[in-house]
Amino acid sequence: MNIKIPRIVIGGTGSGVGKTTIALALTQILRKKGLKVATFKCGPDYLDPTYHSRASQKICHNLDGWLMGKESVLNTFYQACHNVDIVIIEGMMGLFDGHSPNSEIGSTAEIAKWLASPVLVVLDTRGMARTVSAILKGLKIFDPDLNLAGAFANFTGSPSHIQLLKDASTEVPILGGLCKHSEQTFPERHLGLYSASEENVSEEKFNFWGEEGEKSLEVNSILEIANSAPEISIPVSNINTTLKRCKIGIAMDSAFHFYYEENLMRLRQAGAELVFFSPLSDSKLTDVDGLYFGGGYPEVFAPTLSKNKSLLNYIQDLSYKNIPIYAECGGLMYLSKGIKLVEGEFFPMLGLISATSIMEKKLKALGYVEVTTKKETIFGEVGLRFRGHQFRYSDLELDESNPIELVYNLRKRKSDQVSEEGYSKNSILASYIHAHWASNPNLAEGFVQSCLRK
């Protein structure tokens, strides 16, 4: 199927240059003009999409070349672009950074070329003048197949600084930028930005950057570039959503909200009705056939989670009845015996996994992984392969008197070394890995089948 939709990719020269802020400002400006905006985030990040979803009032989807592959990226793009006027895709890291230092695999540039999208690159221009032209020329000639159509100058000292940079750039037009306003930056914690749904992420900050963008971004030129994006061919899969066959409870609140939208979509297509609940505030669930605990910040909300005894007891009872339970990262911590914070305080949790979650000051794991199941799980048969990502500051202290069965063979993206992970007991499967189910469509169907057999 061929489609033509206005679109831009907002890339950067690296992390921290202000890609998210530019994307949010543009989204708000375009919505104010009456346009329906769809947003995407390149890479495995969970937090930036919460900001794009809030700004666009539509669910933001991840696009990751290594996790998903080209066909799934194109299909996800197509399915999320119905009834929208324009698409904004925020990149990750630097424009050409990805799977390898020697290729574009997994990079923003790869996604931009798959989608035949013009790219607008964001630069940190503090203390910079004519050098901006050299940087942009280098980016442009580095990959002639990439349509580098414009740039944004961020962290400028004044409007006159932005004008100086525009005058200096001869290779790529600078379409405005945002001045330094450190008091209006979005708050961060150990895993990155706070989720946009949390109370300390104010509407004032969103409005501020939208208003700043209106003053300094060349919106008409940006729209012209977006409209120049050519028609692309989408190899649309024949996806038939199965009639609802089971109900799966999805933990969704401030403590648990790291989910790839693709995973939830595939569960629905496999015939699951998704029932959202809050481990922070709900006391029980009604008639569910399975449970899915995503990642998040259980360590931040550990006191509240631990005090909700009625739900803890209810989930324990469901587990004893062999209800399939799948948990990732923060979800794994919730299933453990408890969470020990960096300060030493301990908060009991579900106790379904015989291990204690220990929070550390230093990062414990970060990066892409490939998983092969070495035993049958609630996902299905032995030998299932899929890809995922991990980013954590906690580790598990296993209870040696009650050993856990390890059911994953784990290979890091840049290594041939295989380690064991994936904690399984009865109908429970828990892991630190955030699996992207587009890497193996059988995962959602396998989980639904396990829920039907409960």
UniProtKB/Swiss-Prot annotation:
Organism: Leptospira interrogans serogroup Icterohaemorrhagiae serovar Lai (strain 56601)
Miscellaneous comment in the UniProt entry for this protein: The a and c carboxylates of cobyrinate are activated for nucleophilic attack via formation of a phosphorylated intermediate by ATP. CbiA catalyzes first the amidation of the c-carboxylate, and then that of the a-carboxylate.
Biological processes, Gene Ontology terms: cobalamin biosynthetic process
HAMAP family: CobB_CbiA
Family: Belongs to the CobB/CbiA family.
Residues in GATase cobBQ-type domain copies: 247-442
Gene Ontology MF terms in the entry: ATP binding; cobyrinic acid a,c-diamide synthase activity
Domain notes: Comprises of two domains. The C-terminal domain contains the binding site for glutamine and catalyzes the hydrolysis of this substrate to glutamate and ammonia. The N-terminal domain is anticipated to bind ATP and cobyrinate and catalyzes the ultimate synthesis of the diamide product. The ammonia produced via the glutaminase domain is probably translocated to the adjacent domain via a molecular tunnel, where it reacts with an activated intermediate.
SUPFAM superfamilies in UniProt: Class I glutamine amidotransferase-like (SSF52317), P-loop containing nucleoside triphosphate hydrolases (SSF52540)
UniProt xrefs under CDD domains: CobB_N, GATase1_CobB
Protein name: Cobyrinate a,c-diamide synthase
Biological role stated in the UniProt entry: Catalyzes the ATP-dependent amidation of the two carboxylate groups at positions a and c of cobyrinate, using either L-glutamine or ammonia as the nitrogen source.
Known catalytic reactions: cob(II)yrinate + 2 L-glutamine + 2 ATP + 2 H2O = cob(II)yrinate a,c diamide + 2 L-glutamate + 2 ADP + 2 phosphate + 2 H(+)
